[in-house]
Amino acid sequence: MPQLNPSPWLLILLFSWLIFLTMLPSKTQLHTFPNMPSTQNMCKQEPEPWTWPWA
């Protein structure tokens, strides 16, 4: 049964993890967000009352 022979599968597994661990961190660290987060306004705003259209 060739499935039980770990020789080719172990090498494939190791090479795939090697590729994932070398390429993916560099690609994810280069990701930029389209909108940079801004600081929240510190002054307290009063909520405006909302009128229900059916009332």
From Swiss-Prot:
GO biological process per UniProt: proton motive force-driven ATP synthesis
GO molecular function terms attached to this record: proton transmembrane transporter activity
Keywords: ATP synthesis, CF(0), Hydrogen ion transport, Ion transport, Membrane, Mitochondrion, Transmembrane, Transmembrane helix, Transport
Chain intervals for the UniProt region annotation (Disordered): 36-55
Pfam families: ATP-synt_8
Primary localisation category: mitochondrion
Name of this protein: ATP synthase F(0) complex subunit 8
Source organism (scientific name): Latimeria chalumnae
Source organism phylogeny: Eukaryota, Metazoa, Chordata, Craniata, Vertebrata
Gene transcribed to yield this protein: MT-ATP8
